[in-house]
Design a protein with these regions (language model features):
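Residue-level hotspots within pore-lining transmembrane alpha-helices
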Residues: 31, 35, 64-68, 108, ...
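Helix-terminus/linker motif at the lipid-water interface of multi-pass membrane proteins
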Residues: 30, 34-52, 121-127, 183-190, ...
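Small-residue-rich hydrophobic transmembrane alpha-helices
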Residues: 51-111, 147-166, 275-339, 373-395
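Interfacial/gating helices of multi-pass transporter permease domains
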Residues: 43-62, 128-132, 192, 235-242, ...
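Hydrophobic transmembrane alpha-helices of multi-pass small-molecule transporters
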Residues: 63-66, 110, 177-182, 207-211, ...
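Short alpha-helical transmembrane segments in multi-pass integral membrane proteins
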Residues: 1-25, 79-145, 189-244, 301-369, ...
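Short runs within selected transmembrane alpha-helices of multi-pass transporters and secretion channels
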Residues: 72, 139-158, 166-177, 195-210, ...
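Transmembrane helical elements of multi-pass membrane transporters/channels
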Residues: 20-39, 139, 173, 202-206, ...
Length: 454
């Protein structure tokens, strides 16, 4: 199979490959997170209770997206390693196998989430806003496949260097959702349920575009034919060796969000949860460039690892970290300078005006959270690219779960610092964990280079 221009780009200079893959990913991720933020702005007009309900459902929804992301990361890593070792036949087979794997996983996950939704919301402490949470969550989880498949299949396009197809459907989906939100929430008077329906319609369009390219237009680098198809359990194992830990990372973040929600509920009630929901969505937008750059390292590092070119692994990782830090500093400055204006976006109605002062205060020090993410994310995604899914997961677990929960509990509850103490805990836990991640990837790459030289 002859390499096309996309493949030539991602198998060449690692710095150019990172930039080629990263910038479109950043744009698409920013659009998606902006869409989520706008979703919150529209729902904020309904009052703090619906907004808090989204805060309770969001961690569960992130699990769905995380499952798709996990499969996509596993496929991306496996295909990239095959490409690096110049085994194009196996790379194509892995792409086809991933299409079927995504469908199988989606069906299983849908059944599980429909069953556990109500009891899980009770356990999370959503009793005060339970009906709102069900109205928003039930449609999303009944149609889980719509959420999982586009994210999973985007990993295939990233692995073949076709970043346009990996990101364009997501951008279209995000823009469409921004248009549909006010129509379904207010014009059709569907309230919080309308927000869920708008999300599903926009993501379904995204999925249709991807399937059109794969099975109707048929002009992708990899060819999707199921003639003589047999499930390759060895490939499924390879995909899931990275995919399960990567998906568990998203699950871990959801669990942390649930735990932090409970801590906020204890120290500040529903209004604190509503504020945290907004703040985390703002932070998510701020770190998206860093995450986009780190995501590109899965492909570039995977190709270098498959080719046993360990020097390129170091170059790609260091360059990704440098770009991530630059973007983190810029977004942090924007938050500091425009904190009052950003907070005002969430206080345009009498129902939601109470959360604005707290948001404005928090935005002035969240740079302490945003900047360290570059270290932790780059390390985790580089390990995924090399097929070290467990290592990536363990680094994420200590950074985003163990340390964050410990410090938020100690500062927020044990030391009675309240809501501000919880935010301090988020910052400290993330900073320490990110430093550990950076240390681990530096040691690992140094050992690879030493082994190669010897």
């Amino acid at each position: 199979m002859e390499l096309n221009n996309n493949m030539k780009d991602i198998t060449g200079d690692p710095k150019k490959a990172v930039k080629k893959l990263a910038y479109p990913i950043i744009i698409s991720m920013l659009l998606i997170m902006s869409n989520n933020l706008i979703d919150s702005i529209w729902v904020a007009g309904l009052g703090p209770e619906p907004l808090a309900a989204i805060g309770f459902v969001t961690p569960l929804f992130l699990i769905l997206a995380g499952i798709g992301t996990g499969i996509g990361a596993g496929v991306n890593s496996l295909i990239s390693r095959y490409v690096g070792s110049k085994n194009q036949t196996k790379a194509n087979e892995a792409a086809v196998q991933s299409v079927v794997l995504g469908i199988i996983v989606s069906i299983i996950v849908t059944v599980i989430f429909v069953v556990i939704l109500e009891p899980t919301l009770y356990i999370m402490g959503a009793k005060e806003v339970f009906n709102y949470a069900i109205d928003y969550g039930r449609p999303l989880f009944i149609f889980s496949m719509v959420t999982i498949l586009p994210v999973a299949y985007a990993g295939i396009f990233r692995a073949e260097g076709d970043i346009k197809r990996a990101t364009l459907p997501m951008c279209i989906s995000a823009i469409l959702n921004m248009i549909l939100d006010p129509i379904f929430i207010y014009t059709l008077n569907l309230g919080i349920t309308g927000a869920a329906i708008a999300t599903l319609i926009s993501i379904f369009i995204e999925l249709l575009i991807i399937l059109y390219w794969m099975f109707i237009k048929k002009d992708t680098y990899f060819k999707y034919t199921f003639k003589n198809f047999k499930i390759n359990w060895g490939m499924y194992k390879e995909i899931l060796n990275v995919g399960i830990p990567a998906g568990l990372e998203e699950l871990l973040m959801a669990v942390v969000a649930i735990a932090v929600n409970l801590i906020f509920e204890i120290v500040g009630g529903t209004s604190a949860v509503a504020t945290y929901t907004i703040v985390m969505r703002l932070i998510s937008i701020a770190i998206m460039p860093t995450i986009g750059i780190a995501t590109s390292t899965i492909t570039v590092v995977g190709i270098a690892y498959g080719a046993r070119n360990f020097k390129n692994i170091k170059i790609a990782t260091r360059y990704s970290l440098k770009l991530g830090l630059i973007f983190s500093i810029v977004t942090s400055l924007i938050f500091i300078v425009f904190s009052n204006q950003i907070a005002f976006l969430f206080s345009y109605s009498a129902n939601s005006s109470s959360v604005a002062p707290t948001i404005s205060y928090i935005l002035n020090f969240v740079w302490l959270f945003i900047i360290p993410v570059a270290f932790g994310a780059t390390a985790s995604y580089a390990f995924q690219g090399m097929g070290k899914g467990i290592t990536s997961f363990l680094l994420t677990m200590q950074r985003e779960a163990i340390l964050v929960i410990i410090f938020t509990f100690i500062l927020g509850i044990s030391l009675s610092l309240g809501v501000r103490g919880v935010y301090y805990g988020l910052v400290i836990g993330n900073a320490i964990g990110s430093a550990v991640g950076l240390l681990c990837i530096e040691i690992f790459i140094s050992r690879l280079l030493k082994k190669a030289n010897s």
